[in-house]
Each structure stands twice: as C-alpha cells, then as structure tokens.
C-alpha cells in the first residue's frame, strides 16, 4: 500500500482457519502496528495469529486423542471406549454435536473443550460396528442409524450414501457390521471462466 505522509490506512482484519487474529507487527519484531494512527515512515508489516486450543475432557470410561492442527485449521479428535463401554457421541463446549462417530474432524472457531460421551455396555444386547465415511459408530442390533449431514467436497456434488454399490436407506435396521461410504459426482469444470476472470483482474491491476 502507498500512503501519503501523515495519513492513516484502513486495513481489513485478515483471517486464518483455526486461529485468532493477534494483530499487525513490524516484520521480525514484537512491535505492534496501529493503522488508526498517522503513518510517518515506510513499514514492512506482517499479520500474526494465535492458534485456538482444543482441550479434551478426561473420562474414566475412555480416552480422547487430540491431533495437531493441520494446514486447513482442522483438528481431529479420536475417542476410544474402555472395556465394558461404547462410544455414543461428542460434546463440544458442553453441547451435543451432530457428529456421529470417531474420529471427528472440525475447525475450531475459539478455544474449545471436547468431551466424548460413553455408555455402559449391556451384555444382554448385541452391538454392531458401522463405519460411515471413516467414522466409527456403535449401533445396537435392530436399531437404525441417524443420517449424518451431507458431506461437502470441493468440485464435486454429493449424490448419496452407499453400501456395496447400493444406496443405503437409513430407515433400515442395523443387523450386522457395515461400511457406508459417501459417493460424489464430479462437477463440470469452469477453467475457461476462471481464466477470463484472472485476465480481467490482471487488466484492472495494470
């Protein structure tokens, strides 16, 4: 940015998934920059961020593993029930989530507390393991499985949930172990439009 001596600069606050904006600083220093004050010299400025913390609540009935945050700002939490218990779901900041199974991947938008919900296993009942889009869910024999939210994949259209090549009906009682997978259809490419947009942008910049 070019600014006249003594003027201020309006700068939009940048964002980074999984992080809080911590301010603008002179590059290589701990000197904060306040753009509401008049600018009187050249500056080389960088934005800095603080990573949100994800804390697991300890339980006597199982354990939780919290991954490192990836480049997309995602954190993966994995629950493992102790013998005699089954995993039933997640609570995030004390509230139940729509996430059905484990592991659970999400982008924190603030410092977050994650708790795994466990249930004591009834030895008189039969349970089945259902893997749905990589998440493991334990379902009692004869019960149905809640349909999860439709997954999103960039450049693709979600067309349904499938088991062994056939679309799965979530009203079907679970009577055995299952692997349910999301199926997608590739959307038409728009390279031509993208190229035109880039050329238009370059023209404006010149």
What positions do the PLM features span?
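Secondary-structure capping and domain/repeat boundary segments
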Residues: 1-206
């Amino acid at each position: 940015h070019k600014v006249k001596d003594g003027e201020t600069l309006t700068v939009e606050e940048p964002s980074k998934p999984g992080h809080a904006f911590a301010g603008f600083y002179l590059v290589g220093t701990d000197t904060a920059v306040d753009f509401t004050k008049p600018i009187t010299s050249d500056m080389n400025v960088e934005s800095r961020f603080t990573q949100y913390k994800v804390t697991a609540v300890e339980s006597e009935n199982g354990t939780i593993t919290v991954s490192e945050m990836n480049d997309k700002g995602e954190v993966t939490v994995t629950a493992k029930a102790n013998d005699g218990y089954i995993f039933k779901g997640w609570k995030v900041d004390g509230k139940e989530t729509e996430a059905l199974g484990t592991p659970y991947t999400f982008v924190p938008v603030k410092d977050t507390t994650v708790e795994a919900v466990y249930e004591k296993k009834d030895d008189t009942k039969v349970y089945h393991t259902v893997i749905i889009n990589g998440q493991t869910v334990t379902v009692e024999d004869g019960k149905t499985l809640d349909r999860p939210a439709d997954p999103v994949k960039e450049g693709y259209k979600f067309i349904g949930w499938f088991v062994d090549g056939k679309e799965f009906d979530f009203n079907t009682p679970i009577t055995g172990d299952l692997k349910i997978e999301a199926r997608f259809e590739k959307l038409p490419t728009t390279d031509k439009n993208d190229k035109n947009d880039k050329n238009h942008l370059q023209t404006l910049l010149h």
